[in-house]
Amino acid sequence: AGHDAIMTPNPYAYLDHYQEEPEIAPVTIGGYNTLKKTYSYNPVPADADSLVKQHIIGVQANCWAEYMPTEDNRDYQIFPRLIAISETGWTPMKKKNFTSFCNRMVEDFQRLEAMGVKPCLNFFDVNINTRATQEGVLNVELETFYPGAQIYYTTHGEQPSIHANLY
């Protein structure tokens, strides 16, 4: 018994949400859903019973276009996250590997460019993640998804260069 289901949860599969900081991104409906978060989605929860698991037959990405007046806006909102949700649909969770995905994304970006698609390019940016501890210490982590990229930083407000500290 039961009904088949296509999984399309708001926190992972809505491509009309911001995928980079709202201050630098085109206006969207709201929400925040990064490439990494989209890729991390497991449509078949590990704690689901076998009856539920057998009825999960796919995933779906959603994109409401009321904040995307042009094709360039739509490209930016949809890509590269659509590639991540697609891989989620055909790859079992235990075989997914974000580092491998990022390595393959370099070629996917070249393919998108050749087709005239204008994706969000924050894949190539340095992301700054912060987390406050219970002791009141602010931890800062820098990351980029671009394979092999080196991150240089300064602590005195100057623009980093290859002569700055290597992260």
Give a label for each model feature.
Residues 2-110:
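Conserved alpha/beta catalytic core and glycan-binding cleft of carbohydrate-active enzymes
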Residues 92, 96-167:
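Short, compositionally stereotyped local motifs that mark structural "simplifiers"
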